[in-house]
Curated annotation (Swiss-Prot):
<dbReference type="InterPro" id="IPR003667">
    <property type="entry name" value="NqrDE/RnfAE"/>
</dbReference>
<dbReference type="Pfam" id="PF02508">
    <property type="entry name" value="Rnf-Nqr"/>
</dbReference>
<feature type="transmembrane region" description="Helical">
    <location>
        <begin position="18"/>
        <end position="38"/>
    </location>
</feature>
<keyword id="KW-0813">Transport</keyword>
<comment type="function">
    <text>Part of a membrane-bound complex that couples electron transfer with translocation of ions across the membrane.</text>
</comment>
<keyword id="KW-0249">Electron transport</keyword>
<keyword id="KW-1278">Translocase</keyword>
<feature type="transmembrane region" description="Helical">
    <location>
        <begin position="39"/>
        <end position="59"/>
    </location>
</feature>
<keyword id="KW-1133">Transmembrane helix</keyword>
<feature type="transmembrane region" description="Helical">
    <location>
        <begin position="69"/>
        <end position="89"/>
    </location>
</feature>
<feature type="transmembrane region" description="Helical">
    <location>
        <begin position="182"/>
        <end position="202"/>
    </location>
</feature>
<keyword id="KW-0472">Membrane</keyword>
<keyword id="KW-0812">Transmembrane</keyword>
<dbReference type="InterPro" id="IPR010968">
    <property type="entry name" value="RnfE"/>
</dbReference>
<keyword id="KW-0997">Cell inner membrane</keyword>
<keyword id="KW-1003">Cell membrane</keyword>
<protein>
    <recommendedName>
        <fullName>Ion-translocating oxidoreductase complex subunit E</fullName>
        <ecNumber>7.-.-.-</ecNumber>
    </recommendedName>
</protein>
């Protein structure tokens, strides 16, 4: 149980693939123009991570170390192709919106990194949990960045949610800011870099406050000197 909690804590916050390791920045910055796109790519990446880690862990005893990387890439490519076809079949609007960034999951350093660093050395269950935690950590970062850019750029949230969840999801669209003209900087690549910088700064501030709180609550027990110990006796 402690190992599972540690994996969740590492993937979601302490070793977040997007905000700590800074992996997968290309899709993180390019696709996060809306919350829907960010959530769609994040969930697709999470599914790929879980399936890839499970397959690599299950086959780890039979994969020669000399050719493990090409085999891992083949496994990742097969899983990504399957996910791409599923999105094409059941969420075609999202498939068109994400475009080339779905097949580019194959080259995402998060996927191959977790396969090599964790799944190849650990049991199937923990490897699947590691993939889920890392994927959800990246998804949360993508979603927050996408929501921030969409709100500042268009004044809306969950615009186009029907592309991901179906026609019923049109009711999820929320008009937060009533803008006469869109704030283009938030929607362009410079806005993505600025938003990512704000997220990194926010995480740093939260981490520092958590460290300070732990330091303040830590109880220090003073050590008795030899003379004090004799008097006590």
């Amino acid at each position: 149980m402690s190992e599972a909690k540690n994996l969740l804590a590492q993937g979601l916050w302490k070793n977040n693939s997007a905000l700590v390791q800074l992996l997968g920045l290309c899709p993180l910055l390019a696709v996060s123009s809306t919350a829907t796109n960010a959530l769609g790519l994040g969930l697709a990446t999470t599914l790929v991570l879980v399936c890839t880690n499970t397959a690599v862990s299950a086959l780890r005893r039979w994969v020669p170390s000399e050719i493990r990387i090409p085999i891992y890439v083949m496994i990742i490519a097969s899983v990504v192709s399957t996910v791409q076809m599923l999105i094409n079949a059941y969420a075609f609007g999202l498939y068109q919106s994400l475009g080339i960034f779905i097949p580019l999951i194959v080259t995402n350093c998060i996927v191959i990194g977790r396969a090599e660093a964790y799944a190849a050395k650990n049991p199937v269950g923990l490897s699947a949990l590691d993939g889920f935690a890392m994927g959800m950590g990246a998804t949360c970062a993508l979603f927050v960045l996408g929501a921030l850019r969409e709100i500042l750029g268009n004044g809306t949230l969950f615009d186009g949610a029907d592309m991901l969840l179906g026609s019923w999801a049109t009711v999820l669209r929320i008009d937060i800011l009533h803008l006469d003209t869109p704030f283009l900087l938030a929607m362009l690549p410079p806005g993505a870099f600025i938003g990512l910088g704000l997220l990194l700064a926010g995480k740093y501030v939260i981490d520092e406050k958590m460290k300070a709180r732990k330091a303040n609550t830590r109880v220090s027990v003073p050590q008795l000197q030899d003379g004090d110990a004799e008097k006590a006796l």
